Amino acid sequence: MHATTLTDAEYLRLSGEMLARIEATIDRWLQDDVVDIDGQRTGGLLELSLPGGSKIVVNTQPPQHELWLATRGGGHHFKYVDGAWRDTRDGAEFLLRLSQAASTQAGKPLAF
């Protein structure tokens, strides 16, 4: 697995698009009464508050060109590889890992 070489501008665009996609999904879930998740974004950090009081944090890491995901199950680092954000440990795709964590923490199936 070789990370795609990104310029700083490309990284900021791609990471920003991912945060916006997560926010749009949460907004849709709230509108459709799927699940009550609160998303709070401050710059490159997005904190999701889930039912039961648990949290998931997505954080951009510009110096490393990574996305970091912190869940109740642990932390993961993601690099952009061949058109997708991939876990640096096992190559899992970011949205899959986020969906798994959100489903576990919300107690219902959720897919970003």
Per-segment meaning from a language model:
Residues 2-57, 61-112:
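N-terminal intrinsically disordered, cationic/polar leader segments
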